[in-house]
Structure formats: structure tokens, C-alpha cells
Amino acid sequence: MNNIFKTINNKDSIFLTKKYLDHRFIPETLPHRDEKIKSIAQYWVESLDKITPPDITIYGKTGTGKTAVTLYAKKQLEEVAAEQNLNIRVEYIRCTDYNTEYQILARLCQQLGKPVPYRGWTKAEVVNAFRNLFKKNILGEDLILIVILDEVDVILKNDGDNILYTLTRTDNVAITSISNYIDFKQFIKPKVKSSLRDREIVFPPYNAQQLIDILKERSKVSFSEGAISEGVIALCSALAAKEEGDARYALDLLKTSGEIADEKESSVIEESFVKEAKDRIEHSKIIDVVVTLPIQQQKVLESITYLTKKREEITSGRLYEVYQDLAKNDKVSYRRIFDFINELEMLGLISTNTISRGRGKGRTNIITLQCDIELIDKALIYKD
């Protein structure tokens, strides 16, 4: 058999490259985000005068450009700092990768040239190692550090707000927090909130025309000439605009549509491929969400699918009865079930509707599955 990679690599493709369709790629220009770049820059610019900039909190739904804009501003500040020979560092931490205070501080120490292991030291030793980096006799001039905590809500839920407390209590450190959730500060204790000197920047969703502009720029360098039409770009943009203006989703639609064209050995992307791509992405997204749910939430979802198949009306009380049978001895309280229901609804897997049973009978929550039941079953099998 010939080398499979050579065979695939030599196959005709409508792609010139896929890298520009990856949401992690940071282009030279970010359409419709100039004002947000300036908003970040107006705070960070203080570091060029050797002043620690204020903390920043950036909000916005998935795919609104929060991370891309922040990393774009990071690159530009680093360029100016290098030209002026200033000791300014901007370090990016994704809190899904480093989700405890210890891990984040160890990572920052490593990025700043101090080898600290990810385990084995006490918390006090790691904190001291981090703070020692800011002494003049270690790095010469005062170091100004801007720490970008992307998906900061993850560490707050997982490990509390200790990392924010430590960073805000360290001289010459500024925090830029990024979150999809505008209410994430509910996880921060008052004494830590008071030490945050944060300025807030909100990223609105992209509209359909803005998404068209983004996709046009990316498609020019991603596809062979004539492979993509304005109609395809408009369709991808319209579908993504309905998904709360998610540019990541728009890029994923475009890339998946191109992959389908390659599979069908078509030299152009047809609009029907976009619709097929939408189904693929949604199926993949649902499976990814379900398999990463905590085991107890999976049990609740499994109980909902069971009752759905039996065509029963799903009240929280009936749901808890079935859940108890499934979970057996490893179960949570009835009150905790309400939290799981709310979280599953936020993820779009279910919906709830409060109805009145009539005078004197109170109100009842009715739960409805919002996804293809076979797909949920498939995802629940994957977890095993």
C-alpha cells in the first residue's frame, strides 16, 4: 500500500490552506473591532510610562472576538516595549488548561524564566517564587506584568478567587480577565472585588454584514479562485448571525463546507454543503457538550431521555424519581437537581416551561428535551 499521507496530501483540494479559517489564527487586521483594540490599548498604554495599568474585565459571548482582540493588542504592546527596551511582559493563560492558583502561578514563573514544577511545592513556596520575580535585583528594572486570564470563570468555579487575590496583592501586576458570562463576578468575594481596579469592556455580537466582511477576508487566502461564491458566504454569515453573531461558528461552517466539497470531489462549495455542514457541526457540538458533563448531570439528562421515550410529561418531581433509580446510591439532593436543570437549559439541551395547574394547585415546571434523542443516546454511550 502506498503511503496514505502522500496519497491524501496529493489529492486535489479547493483549499489553499485551512489555517486562516481556524479561530485561533490572529490576522493582521480584525474587521469591526478597531474600537475594542483601542479600548484595551488606552489602559495598557500606561505601562509604557512604567505605571502598572488598571485591571480590565472583558465580557462577550463566544465568537465575538474577545481573545483575538486581546492577543492582537498583546502583540502590539510587546513590539513597542521591545523597541523602547522596557521590561513589560504580557502573558496569556487559558484557564481551561491551568485551572488552579498553583498551576497558574507555576506557569507564569516558567514563562518569566523561573523553573517551578507543576506539583510538589507548597502554595506559599510558589507564591514567594512568583513575587520574587518582581524584585529589582532579579530582573534589573522593575517588571510590569499583564496577566490575561481567558475563561476566568472556569478557575473561579473550580478553585475560587485565590488567584485574583494573589495577583492583585502583587506589585506591578495587572489582570485582564476574559469571560463569556457577564455575571461571573458572583464567584468573587467582596474583599477581592475591592482590590480589583477593573475597567469593563463589552464585546457585542457580530451582525450578518460584519460576518460577511470577516469571511470574505479569510476566504481570499483560504480557497482556490472560483471555489466560493458570495451566496455561500452570505449563507454562512446569516446562520452564524442567528447563533448570536458567533464568528467562530461562521468560520467553522465555511471550513466544514469546504471539507464536504472535497469529499464530494466538487470544485466549488454549494449552498447545500453549508446546510450539511451546519448539521455536522451541531451534532458534533452536542456530543462534545454531553460527554464533558459531570456524571450526575449526565444521569439527569439520561432520566429526561428515558421519560421522553415513554412520552411522559416531565415534571421535576417525576424526573427526580427516575433519576434516583438510575443513580442508585450515588445520587444528589432534590434541590441540587434544580441546579442541574438550569445548567442543562443554559447549554440548550433542554427547555423548561412553568404552567399553572389551576386554582389552588400551584405552578409546575415542565421539562422538554431540545435535541435529537438519538444523538443524546449516542453521546451518553460515548461517556462509558
Curated annotation (Swiss-Prot):
Belongs to the CDC6/cdc18 family. The keyword ATP-binding applies. GO terms for biological process: DNA replication. ATP binds at residues 64-68, 206, 218. It comes from the Archaea. PANTHER family: CELL DIVISION CONTROL PROTEIN 6 HOMOLOG, CELL DIVISION CONTROL PROTEIN 6-RELATED. One of its GO terms (molecular function) is ATP hydrolysis activity. Keywords: ATP-binding, DNA replication, Nucleotide-binding. The keyword Repressor does not apply. Involved in regulation of DNA replication. SUPFAM superfamilies: P-loop containing nucleoside triphosphate hydrolases (SSF52540), Winged helix' DNA-binding domain (SSF46785). This is ORC1-type DNA replication protein.
